[in-house]
Amino acid sequence: MTSNMRAGLITLLTIAVIAPAAMANERFTASAIKEEIIGKRIYLAVPFGGEFPLNYRPNGQVDGSGEALGLGRFAKPNDKGRWWINGDRLCQQFTSWYKGAPMCFELIRTGDKRLKWIRDNGETGTARIGNSI
């Protein structure tokens, strides 16, 4: 292997390792939200284990189901509402959940298809980006 090939390989490997790390802790912009969140199923990590799926549909509807987590025993297991983007924040409002109150979230990339959310009331959590719906 020539020194030019070796230098090129080292550069390529360095980029492959550094690029994902550079993306971590990057705030989602409005365009990134549209591109990477809208039209996808987002899985919210829940404190007692498992994941809570929310579907952000391209038509502005958001819906979710907590049936797999057994939420029907405690609250309405399914709900739907609407989503919108305000600045660089993803906002949503459900029909019943959270008493129908609107809420907005700042999204921060923490890795490949992983994010941290910060709600406008200061609550935080994590989620993963699933497949297209």
Functional labels for PLM-detected ranges:
Residues 2, 20-80, 86-133:
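Lipid interaction determinants
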Residues 9-12, 34:
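Short N-terminal leader segment in a subset of presequences, especially plant chloroplast
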Residues 13-21:
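Hydrophobic core
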